[in-house]
A protein has these predicted regions:
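Long amphipathic alpha-helical segments
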Residues: 53-58, 91-95
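Helix-adjacent hinge/juxtasegments
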Residues: 13, 17-56
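Short, contiguous alpha-helical
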Residues: 1-23, 65-116
């Protein structure tokens, strides 16, 4: 979950054209999950704002230097990255015959329903 939050943070940082910085958490904190969920809430709100902006060329810094890409491509990559991890979770659960967790309940539609 830390990886997912950190990656979401970086995608948001790029879209908001903020300077590169790493997102770090106290891995030993008893509040780690709550802190991650709180961070995701803020990240999600920032990403939602990006949807309303015109597509544009975004220049951003990575650990490997400066890059430039359309905002729509960055958003697409973020979605593909999330989907990749979703598939990995399903494969890991399936390998161990764990089927009582329905990932459809954790889809964006399920998330939006939970907010009502």
């Amino acid at each position: 979950m830390v990886h997912i939050v950190a990656a979401s943070y970086l995608y948001g940082q790029r879209l908001e054209e903020k300077p590169f910085s790493k997102f770090e958490f106290d891995m030993d904190s008893q509040d780690l999950i709550d802190n991650l969920l709180s961070a995701l809430d803020g990240i999600d709100n920032g990403l939602i704002e990006q949807v309303y902006k015109e597509d544009r060329e975004v220049t951003y810094e990575t650990s490997k230097g400066m890059r430039s890409q359309k905002a729509s491509v960055i958003l697409s990559m973020m979605i593909f990255h999330t989907t990749e991890h979703r598939a990995q979770i399903v494969a890991a659960l399936d390998k161990h015959n764990v089927r009582e967790i329905n990932l459809d309940h954790y889809s964006i539609f399920g998330y939006l329903e939970s907010l009502k």
